[in-house]
Each structure stands twice: as structure tokens, then as C-alpha cells.
């Protein structure tokens, strides 16, 4: 889930009134005084121009005011927790949410099943999410990867969705843009209705080669078409409406926003799977400008609230570090693409990160690089590592504050 100040000045001008400037009918003077002896009447002094009224103070943005109030009331531990999108543990999930103050939880297929491996009923799943929200001091971001096709978590549960969501390529082949828009609205309605408020989609990677690792998850067309796809999905995903029947039989119409996460910046290209190891992308910066950035730019302009940064090493931006841990890559995201929302790492447990940082320090490096949130299954040790980094002077608390502002702004 991305602030206008109005200024107005009033300028008052005083007209200088000069007597005797108008032309009148000539009159015979009663007496003409001698030269040099006449009393010359001085024109009246002009009244001073009034000072312009001062410009009124801009009205404070209620959302920014609320965010600053929340931030001011948080301890360092609470602020550090907000930086984490925690993969839900199998046991004591509510306790972890409460004790670690995490900003969000990310659900996988297992989280839609009970202990016996059976799909949860809608009622049971909603109760599960409500319990997590009740445990959180600050409302939780509840996320899922519901791309459709090969990556579909929630829609595999037949108690939550009428059918599994299809891939963007399948949808476009069926009914082009109409099917893409209908699917986005359908997914949002059902995700929101059961308590999920963030979808880690759409995939904004440009891939036209079926041999690419990311191809089956991507739109599968060129950069311009992929940009149009991303824009279409984000615009249709901005709101979702559904009708709720209350216990007393009354009907309420609800319209909610769902958070969209564009991925995987700066663009996956034809790189290998970074779940198991490093991928090095040696393409030129010009190719990214002309191709890979287009879908991300389209999604940002359409209002996407978050961008997920990959673990690829992109040599034209940073030849040493994975994009997720690279300040240079985040600078491109902020300055070249003008993104002001929440930057999120890909999962820190993935193999591509392991050789660059130990478990705890990876989160610190991610925040130092410019991420606002990190995805992890080890929030306990990593939250503490952020607290320790601030206490030790490695990480400025102001950097944590700025990240938390973005996270809270996305929530509210």
C-alpha cells in the first residue's frame, strides 16, 4: 500500500490619485496674482499602500500528521520491527508478531492449510488473520505472492477462490486487456475480503525467451507491451469493491485499496534463478533505460506503493553487490525512476545473498543500501541486528525513521 500542499498569496495594489489631472471647461479666474507671489497648493500625499496579507500557513496533511505521531511514540525496537516482512512461522506466529513488532507477514501455500495439511475454511483463515492483526501493535501488512499461473498461493485454496488465478500470458491469450483487468479486480476482491492487503505482483520483468527462468511468470512480450500490462494491472488493482452481508441481514458495499509490489527491480532479464545462487547481469545501462525500466516506470506512475529489488548483480550499476544490497541500485530507483514508495528486498534467505552477508548483517546491509523493508524467515535475530547497528553507530536512527515513515505511509 504511495501529499500536496496548497499555497496562496494575496497582493493588494493601491491606486495613486493625482488631483487636477482631468481636463475641465476653462473658467475666468477672479484674480490673477502677481508672478512669483501665488500660493501653490501642494498635491495631497498619497496614502501608503497597504502591506499584502501574509500567505496562509499550508494545511497539514492528516496522513503525514498521523504517521509522525505514530513514529514519535515508537521505541527503537518497535521501529526496527516495522522494517520486516516476516515469513509466517509454523508455531507461535501471534507471539512473534507481537514481540518483534513486525511491519508485515508474508504468506505461502502452507499458511492456507491446517496442521493436517487440509485447506483452511474461509472462516478459519479469516480468524487466523484477525488474530495476527490483534497481536500487532500497528496494523499489519499481510502479503502473498498471487501472480497467477505457476506462482499462486491463496487462489489454490478452493475455500477462498472459485478457481486458481491464471498467468498473465494465459489471460492475454484468452481475452487480451479485458481479461487482464478483470483478473486484477477479481484477485483484489477475494484477497481483500479474507484479510490480505498486499499482493506481491505484478511481475514487471521483460522476457520474451521461453528459455528464461522468469519467462513463465512474466507477461512474455516486449518492453512496451509489458509496461502497458503493468500499468493496467496497477490501475485495476488500486481499489477493489465487494459486498458484505452483516449478521442482521443488512448489506454494506466496501471499497478497499490493495498494495501492489512491482518486481524484480532492476529487471530480471535472462538471468538464472537467484534462489539457489548468484546471477550476474552484464548488460549495458542503456539497455535498462530503453527496456527494463519501462514497466517499472509505468507501474510507479500508475501508483504502485512498493518495489521489490532482486538479488541479481547488475554490473552497470554495481559490479560487487547484489542489487538488493547495493546503494547504487537504490539510488537509480529513487532518482532515475523517481520512486518515493517502499523498497523491499527479495527474500534474504535466498542463496544469492548468503555469500555476501551473514544472517543478521544482511538486514543491516539492506537498510544501509536504501531498503525500507526486508523479507525474512529469521526476523528475531535480524530485528535485533538492526537495533544493535543503531546502538553501535553503524546505522543512523534517522535512516530507520525514514524507512518507517514510508512503511507507515503505505499502511495509512
Region annotations inferred by a language model:
Residues 82-91, 166-181, 277-291, 351-356:
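Active-site mouth loops of central-metabolism enzymes
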Residues 136-184:
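Substrate-binding cleft of extracellular glycoside hydrolase catalytic domains
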Residues 88-99, 180-190, 288-295, 357-365:
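Short, acidic/polar
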Residues 21-156:
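N-terminal hydrophobic targeting/anchoring segments and the immediately downstream early-domain regions
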Residues 75, 105, 116-131, 140, ...:
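Second-shell residues forming the walls of enzyme active-site clefts
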Amino acid at each position: 500500500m504511495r501529499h500536496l500542499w496548497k499555497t496562496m498569496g494575496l497582493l493588494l495594489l493601491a491606486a495613486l490619485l493625482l488631483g487636477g489631472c482631468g481636463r475641465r471647461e476653462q473658467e475666468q479666474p477672479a484674480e490673477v496674482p502677481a508672478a512669483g507671489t501665488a500660493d501653490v497648493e501642494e498635491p495631497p500625499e498619497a496614502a501608503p499602500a497597504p502591506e499584502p496579507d501574509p500567505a496562509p500557513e499550508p494545511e497539514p496533511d492528516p496522513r503525514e500528521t498521523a504517521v509522525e505521531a505514530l513514529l514519535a511514540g515508537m521505541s527503537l525496537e518497535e521501529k526496527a520491527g516495522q522494517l520486516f516482512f516476516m515469513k509466517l512461522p509454523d508455531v507461535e506466529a501471534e507471539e512473534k508478531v507481537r514481540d518483534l513488532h513486525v511491519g508485515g507477514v508474508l504468506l505461502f501455500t502452507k499458511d492456507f492449510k491446517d496442521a493436517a495439511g487440509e485447506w483452511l475454511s474461509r472462516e478459519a483463515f479469516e480468524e487466523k488473520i484477525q488474530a495476527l492483526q490483534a497481536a500487532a501493535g500497528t496494523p499489519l501488512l499481510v502479503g502473498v505472492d498471487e501472480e497467477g499461473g505457476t506462482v499462486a498461493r491463496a487462489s489454490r485454496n478452493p475455500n477462498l477462490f472459485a478457481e486458481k488465478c491464471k498467468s498473465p500470458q494465459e489471460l492475454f491469450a484468452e481475452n487480451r486487456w479485458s481479461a487482464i483487468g478483470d483478473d486484477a479486480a477479481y484477485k483484489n476482491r477475494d484477497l481483500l475480503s479474507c484479510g490480505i492487503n498486499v499482493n506481491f505482483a505484478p511481475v514487471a520483468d521483460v522476457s520474451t525467451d521461453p528459455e528464461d527462468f522468469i519467462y513463465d511468470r512474466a507477461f512474455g512480450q516486449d518492453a512496451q507491451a509489458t509496461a502497458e500490462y503493468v500499468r493496467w494491472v496497477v490501475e485495476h488493482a488500486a481499489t477493489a469493491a465487494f459486498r458484505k452481508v452483516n449478521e442482521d441481514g443488512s448489506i454494506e458495499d466496501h471499497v478497499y485499496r490493495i498494495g501492489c509490489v512491482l518486481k524484480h527491480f532492476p529487471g530480471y532479464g535472462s538471468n538464472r534463478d537467484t534462489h539457489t545462487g548468484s546471477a550476474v547481469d552484464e548488460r549495458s545501462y542503456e539497455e535498462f533505460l530503453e527496456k527494463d525500466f519501462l514497466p517499472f516506470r509505468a507501474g510507479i506512475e500508475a501508483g504502485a506503493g512498493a518495489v521489490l529489488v532482486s538479488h541479481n548483480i547488475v554490473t552497470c550499476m554495481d559490479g560487487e553487490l547484489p542489487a538488493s544490497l547495493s546503494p547504487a541500485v537504490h539510488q537509480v530507483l529513487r532518482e532515475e525512476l523517481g520512486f518515493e514508495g517502499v523498497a523491499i528486498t527479495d527474500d534474504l534467505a535466498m542463496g544469492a545473498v548468503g555469500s555476501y552477508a551473514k544472517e543478521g548483517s544482511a538486514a543491516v546491509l539492506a537498510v544501509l543500501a536504501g531498503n525500507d523493508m526486508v523479507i525474512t524467515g529469521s526476523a528475531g535475530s535480524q530485528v535485533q541486528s538492526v537495533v544493535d547497528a543503531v546502538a553501535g553507530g553503524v546505522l543512523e536512527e534517522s535512516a530507520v525513521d525514514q524507512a518507517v515513515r514510508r512503511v507507515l505511509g503505505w499502511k495509512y
